[in-house]
């Protein structure tokens, strides 16, 4: 496994990370097996913004005795207390969800605490007004959150938060479709997106890449707008070649 160093820290992050959206639909035993296999293969970076609450107790069991081997990307605004994914900027919801996530992950710290999925100015305004931003900053000051991050699909919001000088990592969608104007989250021109990647690199903000295969669409010639299937390796390398990228988060279904 290859590793890249976090610019604002000394963590060595595996260039291949693991997303949790797909694996979260599996049985608990299969989730545990997949996470442990990923660790054995040298994967050490895991995103926790999946679609199902089941990933949290499963990860908690998978990481027993191995918590130091994993870095978790936990989202302040992703709510799982109802059993499935929900999104909120309300402080009480975020506090309740983070408490629940920590309990089920069986951990007392968060490697990367993310301001979750802010795609519009109104989202950031609500996050600040409701006290959610202060909450995550307070948790960082207390040492519970080690690094701050942001997940977004829009270059505009990414640049807005970069201006605030708060984050060490940004989660952003990078794949050939989005960079060249194809797909739901193809937001911003190719030049705007590349300028963002270069800014992150220049300012020492690492990028963790989501949606590298666009839910498998790029791997299927019949579904791809390019009418040609790419391999998983091609998609991963495409993202890793972009400025600022530390890790690419694929979403395995199971082993």
Please identify what each model-predicted range represents.
Residues 7-23, 73-85, 114-117, 213-217:
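N-terminal small/glycine-rich loop or linker at the start of catalytic domains
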Residues 6, 18, 46, 59, ...:
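Conserved, mostly hydrophobic/aromatic
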């Amino acid at each position: 496994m290859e590793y890249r160093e976090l610019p604002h820290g000394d963590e060595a992050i595996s260039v291949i990370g693991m997303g949790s959206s797909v694996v979260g639909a599996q049985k608990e035993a299969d989730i545990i097996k997949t996470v442990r296999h990923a660790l054995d293969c040298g994967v050490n970076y895991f995103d926790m913004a999946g679609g199902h609450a089941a990933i949290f107790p499963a990860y908690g069991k998978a990481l027993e005795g191995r918590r130091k081997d994993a870095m978790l990307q936990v989202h302040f605004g992703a709510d799982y207390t109802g059993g499935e994914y929900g999104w909120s900027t309300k402080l009480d919801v975020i506090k309740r969800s983070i408490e629940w996530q920590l309990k089920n992950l069986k951990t007392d710290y968060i490697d990367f605490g993310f301001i979750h999925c802010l795609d519009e100015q109104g989202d950031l305004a609500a996050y600040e007004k409701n006290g959610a931003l202060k909450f995550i900053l307070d948790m960082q000051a207390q040492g519970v959150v080690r690094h701050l991050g942001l997940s977004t699909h829009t270059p505009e919001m990414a640049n807005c938060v970069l201006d605030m000088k708060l984050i060490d990592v940004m989660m952003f969608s990078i794949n050939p479709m989005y960079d060249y104007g194809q797909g739901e989250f193809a937001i911003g021109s190719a030049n705007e997106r590349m300028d963002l990647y270069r800014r992150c690199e220049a300012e020492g903000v690492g990028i963790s890449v989501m949606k590298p295969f666009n839910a498998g669409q790029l791997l299927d010639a019949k579904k791809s707008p390019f009418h040609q299937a790419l391999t998983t390796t091609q998609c991963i390398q495409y993202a890793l070649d972009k400025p600022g990228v530390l890790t690419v988060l694929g979403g395995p279904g199971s082993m």
